[in-house]
């Protein structure tokens, strides 16, 4: 009987757990390590912030889902992974050995600017939602679709919102919605420090806020960077087309924490879900000593971007659209995703 440890409960591992609930893997003893018994679905986070959903409507009960698939749920945070000794050590000091490990632990907000500890990082989502109280003046550092969605959601709740972006990585449609909803959008204006107050520093300018939210790009978890697994230049686990580590074949990785060596693609929930479908197939094959199936990511992914109110933008390659009907479409997709784990 093989010992399999699933580290983290991101999109890919949720797909794995759902598959195991439908068809358990009887010739393996499986454990899932996660700091939270319930996982907030990232696609519905802006809707929670805007007041359209209760948090409970956007959570997956991973402890119950694991139990249905005969997977042991182990609450805790990973402190160290030793892929040479095949052990996982938790912050509690507990050790667990494995024959196979799969990592889908997501990423952190990448912020190296001075004073970042005075800000509220958007990840992990569970801690972000528990700590956030929407005050009068909010600064959001880091654009991209995630930063824009959070800005418009918080603005919808009545706050004065300033969105700082070092580069213009969002579409003209999204920019128009930011302007329309009176978000103070400042592209090409990198934040150089966050001082007590908190004060946001951009060049020689200083502006005071009640809360600063960090929604900058993805950064790897420290224990993953220090694990000895081969990583890409940004510190994410390098995997081959079967989602196995290129340096340690007993380790799989998926979602934000992984980078495909030959076919790198953007880090988003859409790709992570596809990873999950390939991952469970290859975990079953690996336990059965069968050949693994290669995974090929799609060239383009659909992005559905909410705009605070019940209004959203759809983007897929060169095609885009917007309106209340896009929000309704996204709402149906998101609710169906949550229901699939009940």
Residue ranges and their predicted role:
Residues 127-164:
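Rossmann-like NAD(P)H-binding beta-loop-alpha module
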Residues 72-81, 88, 96, 157-241:
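A Rossmann-like FAD-binding core segment of flavoenzymes
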Residues 2-72, 149-173:
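Beta1-alpha1 glycine-rich phosphate/pyrophosphate-binding loop at the start
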Residues 3-5, 68-137, 213:
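FAD-binding core/adjacent interface of flavoenzyme oxidoreductases
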């Amino acid at each position: 009987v093989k010992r399999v440890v699933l580290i983290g409960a991101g999109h890919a591992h949720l797909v794995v757990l759902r598959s195991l609930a439908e068809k358990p893997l009887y010739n393996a003893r499986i454990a899932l390590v996660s700091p939270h018994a319930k996982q907030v679905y990232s696609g519905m986070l802006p809707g929670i912030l805007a007041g359209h959903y209760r948090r409970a409507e956007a959570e997956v009960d991973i402890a119950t889902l694991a139990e249905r698939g005969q997977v042991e749920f182990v609450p805790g945070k990973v402190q160290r992974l030793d892929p040479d000794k095949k052990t996982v050590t938790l912050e509690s000091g507990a050790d667990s050995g494995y024959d196979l490990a799969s990592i889908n632990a997501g990423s952190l907000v990448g912020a190296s600017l001075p004073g970042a500890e005075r800000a509220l990082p958007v990840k992990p989502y569970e801690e972000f939602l528990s700590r956030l109280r929407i005050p009068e003046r909010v600064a959001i550092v880091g654009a991209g679709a995630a930063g824009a969605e959070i800005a418009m959601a918080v603005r919808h709740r009545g706050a004065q919102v300033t969105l700082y972006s070092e580069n213009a990585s969002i579409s003209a449609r999204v920019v128009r919605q930011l302007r329309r909803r009176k978000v103070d959008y400042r592209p090409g204006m990198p934040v150089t420090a966050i001082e007590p107050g908190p004060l946001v520093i951009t060049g020689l300018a200083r502006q005071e806020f009640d809360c600063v939210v960090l929604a900058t790009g993805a950064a790897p978890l420290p224990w993953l960077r220090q694990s000895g697994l081969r990583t890409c230049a940004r510190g994410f686990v390098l995997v081959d087309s079967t989602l196995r580590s290129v340096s340690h074949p007993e380790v799989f990785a998926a979602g934000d924490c992984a980078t495909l060596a030959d076919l790198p693609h953007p880090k988003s929930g859409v790709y992570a879900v596809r990873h999950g479908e390939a991952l469970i197939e290859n975990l079953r094959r690996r336990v059965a000593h069968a050949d693994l199936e290669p995974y090929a990511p799609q060239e383009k992914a659909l992005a559905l971007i909410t705009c605070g109110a019940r209004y959203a933008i759809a983007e897929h390659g060169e095609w885009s659209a917007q309106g209340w009907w896009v929000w309704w479409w996204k709402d149906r997709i998101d609710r169906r995703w949550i229901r699939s784990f009940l």
